[in-house]
Structures are given as structure tokens and as C-alpha cells.
Amino acid sequence: MGKPTGFLEFERKSNVGTSPLERIKNYKEFHTPLPENERRQQASRCMDCGVPFCQNGKPIMGMVSGCPLNNLVPEWNDLLYTNEYEAAAHRLLMTNNFPEFTSRVCPALCEAACTCGLNGDPVSVKENENFIIEFAYNSGLMQPNPPKVRTDKNIAIIGSGPSGLACADQLNKRGHNVTVFEKDDRIGGLLTVSYTHLTLPTNREV
């Protein structure tokens, strides 16, 4: 835990959004990221709880509490605060196949389960995640990483939506030969053929 008093020293501060009158003029992202030093301060607010409910992702009283992907939230928050961005990206990608769009459209169940939010505002986990993955892209960390050994198994994935592509990615990492089938003329599922393509950049992995 890089800064034990971070949640006491810093109030939650979010990315600044443009006015609605400006937003309706185009489909570009309308939130301006915080300066790097302020984003690191926001990461320092993570309390590194003994039981990190933010990454739990299990049903409590019939409702899912925390990240369903079990993202290692306290770990990469701490790495972000200590200026270890590359390590933070590696930790993020260990559990999340597509943080470039979960950091934009996810409902942030992690923040709803954040212990810091019991008596104040939760840690801005979603925006921290977005900062990390944007750093990874801008610094050239996001490169093809084919497995060193291939198995003799051939697997078909029906549908190229987020779950299908995530499944294909995981199977490919294990060395299997994966073929993705898609009925539409482009891959991405709802991310590219529904309203979300108006709110997400689609010129990266999808």
C-alpha cells in the first residue's frame, strides 16, 4: 500500500466532462482525463482493504458485489500511484481481456463495493483503469503475444461479441487453434453493430 493516508488526504475527483451542448455535436469521447499527478492521487485513495470487496465478484445477499472479472483492483491502483504504469497494465491484463472498453462502458460494480464509499466517495476505479490501458496503448505495450507452444486442439467460437472474443483470447493463450464465426459483416458484436459503436472507439482490437 503506497500511501496509507491517501483516502484521508484526497477527495474523489473525476474526469471533466464537456457540456451537453458540445457533446451532441459529435460522437467523440467527452471526458477530459485528469492530469497525471492528479490521477495518481486518485489511485492513492485505494485503502488496500484486508477483504477487497471491489474485486470479489461474488453474490452477497443475492447480488453480485464487486468486479465479476475479479480484477486485481488494489494491486494496480497501488502500482498506478507508485508510477509503475507498465506493471499496472500487466496486472490489469491478467484478468481483463478488453480493459479498453470495459473502462468506458462497464457499470463499475467495483466502485459500488468499494469500502471507501461506505463513508464518503468510492475510489475512481473505472477512470484509473482507463488511464492504465490508455498508457499501455500509447506506450506501445499492446503488441501481439502468440503462445510459444500450440496444442493440436481446434476450437470454434460462435459469435464475435465481447464474450466470444474474450473466450477466443483465453483459449489462444493456452495454445489452442481458435476460429471465430460471425454472421455480420464485421466483428465486435453489440460493440460495433449497435448504439455502442457511437460511444466507443473501434479502431483498436475490435
Locate the predicted segments by residue.
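Conserved small/polar residues in nucleotide/adenosyl-binding loops
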Residues: 196-202
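Ferredoxin-type iron-sulfur electron-transfer modules and their immediate structural context
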Residues: 1-154
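Glycine-rich FAD pyrophosphate-binding loop
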Residues: 177-187
